[in-house]
From Swiss-Prot:
Protein name, per record: Diamine acetyltransferase 1
Similarity section: Belongs to the acetyltransferase family.
Keyword Cytoplasm appears in the UniProt entry: yes
Pathway(s) served: Amine and polyamine degradation; putrescine degradation; N-acetylputrescine from putrescine: step 1/1
E.C. number(s) listed in UniProt: 2.3.1.57
Length: 171
């Protein structure tokens, strides 16, 4: 399959973006953790101050999925800032449906993301990969990615909403 198009997502793509988010979560054995709704995606990504940006991979009608979907991959990203090196593109989610892997779609999405990062004068692109996900780790390493957890010893933490509320209410 040589024909596919990578383009910025539009508000009308939110249902497909959510479908792919759920497919990615299932692939990562975390499907029960997706709480986001299509409405959330619409408000958070396509309002006056979007919290995220998204590229999608779209195939022509002759290559649609058996369920009739033309959108077969996506990359959700946002910009952040590192006080040591400046602007960063943070790749939050990146997924190509399994039947559409091996056709260069993922490589083209990553190329487009790299172009966005360079256009915005970002110093680097950061992202997380599950430790067990060797295919993705190898995909990124072949393109020059370095594993900061093993090379620099960084650990990722999170503070859930209940604890944010608790800290915010402290006097």
């Amino acid at each position: 399959m040589a024909k596919f198009k990578i383009r910025p997502a539009t508000a009308s793509d939110c249902s497909d973006i959510l479908r792919l988010i759920k497919e990615l979560a299932k692939y990562e054995y975390m499907e029960d953790q997706v709480m986001l709704t299509e409405k959330d995606l619409l408000e958070d990504g396509f309002g006056e101050h979007p919290f995220y940006h998204c590229l999608i991979a779209e195939v022509p009608k002759e290559h649609w999925t058996p369920e009739g979907h033309s959108i077969v991959g996506f990359a959700m990203y946002y910009f952040t800032y590192d006080p040591w090196i400046g602007k960063l593109l943070y790749l939050e989610d990146f997924f190509v449906m399994s039947d559409y892997r091996g056709f260069g779609i993922g490589s083209e999405i990553l190329k487009n993301l790299s172009q966005v990062a360079m256009k915005c004068r970002c110093s680097s692109m950061h992202f997380l990969v599950a430790e067990w996900n060797e295919p993705s780790i190898n995909f990124y390493k072949r393109r020059g990615a370095s594993d900061l957890s093993s090379e620099e010893g960084w650990r990722l933490f999170k503070i859930d909403k209940e604890y944010l509320l608790k800290m915010a209410a402290e006097e």
